[in-house]
Amino acid sequence: MSRNPEVLWAQRSDKVYLTVALPDAKDISVKCEPQGLFSFSALGAQGERFEFSLELYGKIMTEYRKNVGLRNIIFSIQKEERSWWTRLLKSEEKPAPYIKVDWNKWCDEDEEVNSETASDDESAFVNQDSESSDDDGLLYLPDLEKARNK
């Protein structure tokens, strides 16, 4: 029997982001159909099968971008028409408990107009699996350094 991985979603007027939380995923299989059907399946770290199918709110393009990280897989799916969806799924019922809003990627309509990165897909894929920054937690305080050298 297969299990459902946690799925986080966010949108822009022209695309939908789906983040599948599945560490060390193998044998990833994805299918995007123009009428809005998105299907995913993969094997987890212990070989267990994870899968889900979503009937998305609107029509989508069959091409998608995928970024496989250590802990998750991020999909950027192009909408057929530029518009803001009122929800992720076509069904008006409450979504399954494994589907949640990705507040880290979420952008409201008015924020997108003001944002220069609204069409920049790269921003969704940057530092998703990074555990540390380049500065190794060090903070540079030039005023303290000046005081110490006096």
Curated annotation (Swiss-Prot):
The keyword Cytoplasm applies. It is found in: Cytoplasm; Nucleus. Pfam families: CS. Coiled coil: none annotated. It comes from the Eukaryota. One of its GO terms (biological process) is response to heat. Keywords: Chaperone, Cytoplasm, Nucleus. Widely expressed but preferentially in the root meristem. Residues 112-150 are annotated as: Disordered. The keyword Oxidoreductase does not apply. Signal peptide: none annotated. Residues 2-89 form the CS domain. One of its GO terms (molecular function) is Hsp90 protein binding. Residues 112-123 have a biased composition (Acidic residues). PROSITE patterns: CS. Gene3D superfamilies: 2.60.40.790, 6.10.140.350. Disulfide bonds: none annotated. Interacts with HSP90 in an ATP-dependent manner. PANTHER family: CO-CHAPERONE PROTEIN DAF-41 (PTHR22932:SF1), TELOMERASE-BINDING PROTEIN P23 HSP90 CO-CHAPERONE (PTHR22932). Acts as a co-chaperone for HSP90. Controls root development through the modulation of auxin distribution in the root meristem. This is Co-chaperone protein p23-2. It comes from Arabidopsis thaliana (Mouse-ear cress). The lineage of its organism: Eukaryota, Viridiplantae, Streptophyta, Embryophyta, Tracheophyta. The gene is P23-2.
